């Protein structure tokens, strides 16, 4: 998307684009659609360039579509003429009125396995019907679709009374910090909940508040977690500055991630 580089998060509040506190998508998810199905729908138009700023001619025939400059549209190399080349990279498909994603949804793409499982657990607990409907379409994206230049959870595991959480520590994240940091970054406020469950019944919850050094911290470990006698599953939720970043489940008997 046009602002993905800046908005893909979690971005520290002091690094957000133009100081906008809302310029932050903590856990990005992409919907991938079947192009042939999209183009075959009634009332679908397409443009070779972005419609922003006065727009570009809208087309709706196969002949017009075949004349598009796809070398520019799919070009991911360094831009020589930013203003012009960016317009091509924002080519659009447009439909009139509401659009039902079910008509041509191909996949729902997540950044990594932790975020995939988080989405599945949210759907399963909040909307079982949606979980059944979309679970087979939710996948980890294997392509270079995400910027990976913010803070996110890369691993979350429990073993022998200890929980280990790993944070992203990518070159892209460090580069973004170096480019846009103007002042010392305050620690982020976070909460982790450990829910011990048996047959969907909550037996015990342990909650801990902690802080995260956005620049340097690669992980955190929690010890002294006492498993209740009848607990069969441990659900772990991590919330950073009010945003749910991780929702993992682990079967305690079989040590399998849910």
Where is each model-derived feature located?
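Active-site-proximal loop/hinge segments that shape catalytic or ion-binding/gating pockets
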Residues: 2-211, 218-219, 223, 230-237, ...
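A positional/architectural concept
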Residues: 257-258
């Amino acid at each position: 998307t046009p602002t993905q580089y800046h908005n893909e998060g979690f971005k520290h509040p002091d690094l957000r684009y133009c100081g906008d506190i809302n310029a932050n998508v903590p856990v990005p998810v992409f919907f991938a659609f079947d192009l042939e199905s999209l183009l075959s729908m009634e009332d679908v138009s397409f443009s070779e360039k972005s419609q922003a700023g006065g727009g570009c001619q809208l087309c709706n025939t196969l002949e017009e579509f075949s004349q598009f400059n796809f070398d520019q549209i799919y070009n991911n190399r360094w831009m020589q003429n930013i203003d012009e080349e960016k317009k091509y990279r924002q080519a659009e498909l447009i439909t009139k009125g509401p659009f039902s994603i079910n008509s041509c949804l191909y996949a729902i793409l997540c950044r990594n396995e932790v975020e995939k499982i988080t989405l599945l657990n949210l759907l399963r607990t909040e909307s079982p019907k949606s979980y059944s409907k979309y679970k087979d379409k939710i996948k980890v994206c294997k392509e270079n679709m995400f910027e990976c230049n913010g803070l996110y959870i890369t691993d979350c595991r429990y073993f022998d009374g200890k929980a280990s959480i790993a944070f992203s520590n990518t070159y892209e994240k460090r580069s973004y910090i170096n480019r846009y940091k103007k002042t010392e970054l305050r620690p982020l406020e976070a909460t982790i909940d450990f829910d011990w469950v048996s047959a969907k019944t909550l037996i015990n919850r342990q909650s801990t508040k902690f802080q995260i050094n956005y620049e340097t911290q690669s992980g955190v470990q929690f010890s002294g977690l006492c498993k209740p006698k009848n607990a069969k599953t441990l659900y772990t939720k991590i919330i950073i500055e009010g945003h749910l970043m991780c929702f993992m489940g682990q079967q305690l008997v079989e040590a399998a991630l849910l």
